[in-house]
Amino acid sequence: MHCTITEHFIRHYPEKLNYSGNSDKDELGNGIIIKIRLKELPKGDRKAIFEIPDALKIETGVYHFPEDFNALDLFRKREYYNVYADESGDSPYIEAEIMLHQEYGEEKVRNMLLGLPLNLYNAAESEVYLLYDGARFAWIANGEIVNINFPFGSLKAENGDIYISDSAEIGICRNIKSLESEEKTETKNESIAFYSARGYNTWGGDIVNFYHDGVYHFLVLLDRHHHGNRFGCGAHSTYHMTTRDFIHWENYGEIYPIQNSWESFGTGTMFFWNGKYYYSHGFHTDRVIPRDKVGSRLLEKNYEREGFFSAVTYDELKENGLYPSGANYMVSDDGIHFVQGKKQIHCSENPSIYKDENGGLVMYAGYGAAGVWKAPDIDGPWKKEDTDMPVFDNSSPVRNSSECPSIFEWNGYKYIIMGFRGYWQSGFNDNDFKDLAVVGDDIYDGLCVPMVANCGGRYILAGWVGGSGWAFITLHRELVQHEGGRLGIRWMPELTPNPDELDKIAEVKKVASGEELKLDGKTSYYLECRVKPQKNGRVGLAVSGSGKPFVFELNTERQKVQTLETDNINSFTEEVKALYEYIPEMPEKRTSCAQIPSENIHTNSHDFAIANVRELKDEYTLKIIFHYEKKSDNLVMDAEIGAGRTFVSNRPDFKVGNIKFLTKNAEITDLKLCKMGE
């Protein structure tokens, strides 16, 4: 299986600009590019190499791992300096910090940081460039933006001279409008499985998927620093991928790059309506702008007066001193090149819009609003049809959020998936929805905020793996439907490894309890075997290596699958509760997900259990990928059980070295272990 991903990216040419050794500090607000070439990599403590007093500072130094890791603040941990430490644990760095003056908020001046690991981008061998243009604060290396944050506020240089160290060659350019760039492409032999966008610290967050005219569209919130950008407010844009066969993919990059300091995308849906493609999305503007200054306030007043929502143009919002927020949309003729509608149509910040049976549109309003809304046109009028579904927060026994509703119908049954935990199914050809998450009969498997697309009769689910903070790598699944509409979930055949095409390193006809296999922690592996359990059978894989060991267990009697850290790899661990089993322990008065009395739930994608795994009752095939994620230097274990359930566990700070098989009243046969490569 030869998988490819063709990535579109922007190549910048800062080397063509003219640089000098000084700058007018009063023109900082217009932007600046700083060229830096170190005379040698730093070897000691933190040292300033450039400073504009009270505005911008650039420093270099060396972090020593693992000693320094716990002392780092959260943002620096998410720069992944430790991943690029050398054999002695040293990770030289360069960090830039700007001082932003803000109109809103309690803190009138806030410092924003952005760094680079110099073992990855050696600024002593070639120049790196620091860009600030008001909306972007970025490092450029080899012509690409390789790290970025998004400022909110402005720079104001105070009195004092600019400092330039003699340990680096530094040039300054204020003419950032002359920065040339062009679109380039690169094709990689890579699968979409475990994908996380181009860049050493880029991750995929909430997703949108859609299928039309033989093309599958995959839209993902582009993340750096696990929601840490713009002081923890995210500042996400959306990248867009397509495929016709799920094997060969094209990543077109950002649909719309962040251009204003208030912009941060929330997902909605993509749909084809009246001959055009639409991407409905949210703007989380009030993360940085006071609520009385965002467009939703005007739309709410209009709704109170008129009883419906209608579109308000960005120009009208600006005339009222307001910023766009809530639900917005983009439109395209070809499904690839989108332009802004430049209208706010609703207050929902996760507007899931679909075509309805009458040719109009229906919105399942997520985050910022609630209920089901219908309109004859994208611009409205949007009238509320239903206030009961989907439920969230205080109304939900599992405390699911209202994020990213995904609605689909299959053979007369309707389904709603919402946020990290919400899951409902209707009866046959009716709208009598039952909450299946409260009985543990959902399809959550460690993927976060999943959405589903009907791909010509195949129902494809996608989401991101939790456990590393907000956003990480993304995965695809295929749903299977059973009697009564019950759903199962499996790997996509197109993305499932074929052991005959891989390097087999072990084949065992019958696996004895206690038998072990050795693995290399910086390599990915595929394991496949048959399991024949008795009614009270248990099978476990005790996984050890670099970091805390854990046991992956499949319990036929309890019909549960779980992972749990352990100090004893010679035995099964204690039972882990599935999410629904915590409901009786939660307070009667519902408030938030913080009431769940354990971190060992599927929303954290680490140690958790899934229930009602009916595939365990009979003989089944177990498939596991031990994926080594280079960008975070850790293991992600992904399993398919009996072609009907899946389970993904992220193991931060862990690399596999050994697998010990545990069996009780069960047999493991026909095992194959294959190397998939680094």
Language model segments and positions:
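Carbohydrate-active catalytic/glycan-binding domains of CAZyme proteins
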Residues: 3-27, 31-32, 37-42, 48, ...
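Glycine-rich, compositionally biased intrinsically disordered regions
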Residues: 50-52
